[in-house]
Design a protein with these regions (language model features):
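Bacterial N-terminal signal peptides that target proteins for export
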Residues: 1-9
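Bacterial N-terminal signal peptides
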Residues: 9-18
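Extracytoplasmic small-molecule ligand-binding "clamshell" domains
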Residues: 24-101
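Glycine/Thr-rich phosphate-binding loops of Rossmann-like dinucleotide-binding domains
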Residues: 46-48, 109, 159
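Acidic, polar ligand-binding/catalytic clefts
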Residues: 64, 77-141
Length: 184
C-alpha cells in the first residue's frame, strides 16, 4: 500500500508541475488561496458526490489522502462533478485541476492527459436480456449475431469493441450507466 501511495504521490507531483492555461502552477494558486479543483464523474464505487457535494468513492479517498500527505487539506479543494464524457475535456479546458474516477488507461486518453500508475485491473462485462437468447458472451458474439452493443460515450468498451472487430454501426453510444440501462 505504501508503494501504491508513493506512486499516486508521484503522479500528483507531476500534475502539480503542469502549468495551467494561464501558465500559473497549481502550487502558486494554492499559495494565493485558490482551491484545487478535483473533478470526477459519477462512477460508484470509484468516485461520486455525497449529499453535500463532497468527494466520495475509493479513488477520491486515495487522491484526498495523497493530497493531505502533500500538505493540501480537504478545505483547500473543491469538487467538480462532470458527466463521464466531460472529464478529460474539462481538465483540458481548465475547469478542473485533476480528475479521478477509475479511468482505464487508453492510448487515446494518454494523448490528452497524464495518468498515475494503475490502481487495479478490471475486465469488461456484458449485460444481456434474461436467458441470453442470442448467446452473447463476448465481443466476437456481438459481431457474429449482429447485436447492437450499447456503451457509454468515452467508455473503454468503445476501444475494446473496435479492437475485437465490432463495427461502429453495431454500437450505440449513450451518456453513462443510466443511458445504457435505458437503452436495454
Amino acid at each position: 500500500m505504501n508503494r501504491f501511495l508513493k506512486s499516486i504521490g508521484v503522479f500528483l507531483i507531476i500534475l502539480f508541475s503542469i502549468t495551467a492555461v494561464s501558465a500559473e502552477t497549481l502550487t502558486s494558486k494554492l499559495k494565493r488561496g485558490d482551491k484545487l479543483r478535483l473533478g470526477f464523474g459519477t462512477a460508484v464505487p470509484w468516485a461520486y458526490a455525497g449529499d453535500n457535494g463532497q468527494a466520495l468513492g475509493f479513488v477520491n479517498m486515495i487522491a484526498l489522502t495523497v493530497l493531505e500527505e502533500m500538505g493540501i487539506t480537504e478545505d483547500q479543494t473543491e469538487t467538480k462533478v462532470f458527466e463521464w464524457s466531460g472529464l478529460i475535456p474539462g481538465l483540458n479546458a481548465n475547469r478542473s485541476d485533476m480528475v479521478t474516477g477509475g479511468m482505464y488507461i487508453l492510448k487515446s486518453r494518454c494523448a490528452n492527459m497524464n495518468f498515475s500508475d494503475p490502481i487495479g485491473v478490471f475486465g469488461d462485462a456484458m449485460m444481456v436480456p434474461k436467458g441470453n437468447p442470442m448467446g452473447i458472451n463476448n465481443y466476437a458474439d456481438v459481431v457474429r449475431t449482429g447485436a447492437k452493443l450499447v456503451t457509454g460515450a468515452g467508455f473503454n468498451t468503445v476501444e475494446a469493441a473496435k479492437k475485437y472487430g465490432v463495427p461502429e454501426s453495431q454500437m450505440m453510444l449513450v451518456e453513462g450507466e443510466v443511458g445504457i440501462l435505458a437503452a436495454m
